[in-house]
Amino acid sequence: MNNSTNSSNNGLAITSPYKTFEVVFIVLVAGSLSLVTIIGNILVMVSIKVNRHLQTVNNYFLFSLACADLIIGVFSMNLYTLYTVIGYWPLGPVVCDLWLALDYVVSNASVMNLLIISFDRYFCVTKPLTYPVKRTTKMAGMMIAAAWVLSFILWAPAILFWQFIVGVRTVEDGECYIQFFSNAAVTFGTAIAAFYLPVIIMTVLYWHISRASKSRIKKEKKEPVANQDPVSPSLVQGRIVKPNNNNMPGGDGGLEHNKIQNGKAPRDGVTENCVQGEEKESSNDSTSVSAVASNMRDDEITQDENTVSTSLGHSRDDNSKQTCIKIVTKAQKGDVCTPTSTTVELVGSSGQNGDEKQNIVARKIVKMTKQPAKKKPPPSREKKVTRTILAILLAFIITWAPYNVMVLINTFCAPCIPNTVWTIGYWLCYINSTINPACYALCNATFKKTFKHLLMCHYKNIGATR
């Protein structure tokens, strides 16, 4: 940072390049931005901690990003404001180098976290069958650690030890900037590695993500008939499984569980882990049926056998105390997250009257599953996650591009960049840390609701907010 300095002067009015009212204005604005950044990123971190619906792999990456942004809000913004309004660096060369190392390592960690988020979403969309198996909390932790370690290796040694590498410290007293920025090769190398290359990669990844998402939505829209046809009786099995208490094998208590989907094992939960950051919604009719059946009261059960066209196999055993009703429905194409089977257990019914009531419940379930399935809406959760990534990516490019362009220009022509323009460009990088929490809230309803509960001190049931 090439601020005009005069370390021999002690008065603010003499050393500061700004007038008194300008200093007050800068301090108020910078202090407000710092406070908003701190509060916003603390809200993100606390929201993920207290709300179990936000404790997803994707949001763990956002948690790491919020940690980096919080450090920027606490240290980087305030020290740079001090440096700006006073007009010189008052804390000595050691603190200067430590501040610069922390500032650039944390800022680059933000970039690396954005890169990880983009890669994570890309693999979720392009490899929905294989990637979720590897997408574990442990893997996320390793990726986050790698982002921070790489950022440290890229910036900290060069900032802290460059003066020893070249044999002299060229940064004058009262100034604080990275010494190797005067070296064109090193400046270009770090700028490309820290900004330009990640931006290119993230842009390409987002283009592929967007194209894959649009292709999936178009494919679903082309199949309205398959989504609206009634479920065929051959694909609906209502089975009453009555375990014999005298011959119950170990393990599952004698209940029979068969998962059938056109002769293949169902693809349960294949991509559900990849659609993170949003509330999980149930869109399968058999799931709704199981909820209705489990909540039925005896007085709600009426014998309406004429409405059932599917026969139900059953066996009688007065000693049995469990009934298992299993519904297997045909999974919709393109909806690999929807369960293909639902098991409903009715406990406590025995004897002939109990069997009759259970049979009636089974018939009602089969009747409900035979109703025409509602057309599944477009995958809004997937669109919201993609939209969040787009918002974060655009905010990053807009706020970081001016400074990184000026860094390259400064290598060849330092006087070409006015001090005020440099300061604004530097501050724009910091403002990105202020914007990120707003991106989460605007693009993610669960984050937004949790933020609201925390700010209004409504802690009841906050852990289950959707």
Swiss-Prot record:
Entry's localization field: Cell membrane; Postsynaptic cell membrane
PROSITE patterns tied to this protein: G_PROTEIN_RECEP_F1_1, G_PROTEIN_RECEP_F1_2
Pfam families: 7tm_1
Sequence motif: Important for signaling, positions: 120-122, 436-440
Modification Phosphoserine, positions: 232
Topology, Extracellular side: 1-22, 81-97, 163-184, 411-418
Transmembrane regions: 23-45, 60-80, 98-119, 140-162, 185-209, 388-410, 419-442
Gene3D superfamilies: Rhodopsin 7-helix transmembrane proteins (1.20.1070.10)
InterPro entries registered for this protein in UniProt: GPCR_Rhodpsn (IPR000276), GPCR_Rhodpsn_7TM (IPR017452), Musac_Ach_M2_rcpt (IPR001065), Musac_Ach_rcpt (IPR000995)
PTM sites of type Phosphothreonine: 446, 450, 465
GO BP annotations, alphabetical order: adenylate cyclase-inhibiting G protein-coupled acetylcholine receptor signaling pathway; chemical synaptic transmission; G protein-coupled acetylcholine receptor signaling pathway; G protein-coupled receptor signaling pathway, coupled to cyclic nucleotide second messenger; presynaptic modulation of chemical synaptic transmission; regulation of heart contraction; regulation of smooth muscle contraction; response to ethanol
Segments for region (Disordered): 218-289
Keyword Transport appears in the UniProt entry: no
Membrane topology: Multi-pass membrane protein
Cysteine pairings via disulfide bonds: 96-176, 413-416
Gene Ontology cellular component annotations, sorted alphabetically: asymmetric synapse; axon terminus; cholinergic synapse; dendrite; glutamatergic synapse; membrane; neuronal cell body; plasma membrane
Organism domain of life: Eukaryota
Glycosylation sites: 2-3, 6
Entry's Gene Ontology molecular function annotations: arrestin family protein binding; G protein-coupled acetylcholine receptor activity
Keywords (A to Z) from UniProt: Cell membrane, Disulfide bond, G-protein coupled receptor, Glycoprotein, Membrane, Phosphoprotein, Postsynaptic cell membrane, Receptor, Synapse, Transducer, Transmembrane, Transmembrane helix
Post-translational modification remark: Phosphorylated in response to agonist treatment.
Cytoplasmic side: 46-59, 120-139, 210-387, 443-466
Its biological purpose: The muscarinic acetylcholine receptor mediates various cellular responses, including inhibition of adenylate cyclase, breakdown of phosphoinositides and modulation of potassium channels through the action of G proteins. Primary transducing effect is adenylate cyclase inhibition. Signaling promotes phospholipase C activity, leading to the release of inositol trisphosphate (IP3); this then triggers calcium ion release into the cytosol.
Family assignment from sequence similarity: Belongs to the G-protein coupled receptor 1 family. Muscarinic acetylcholine receptor subfamily. CHRM2 sub-subfamily.
Quaternary organization: Interacts with ARRB1 and ARRB2. Interacts with RACK1; the interaction regulates CHRM2 internalization.
Protein's name in the database: Muscarinic acetylcholine receptor M2
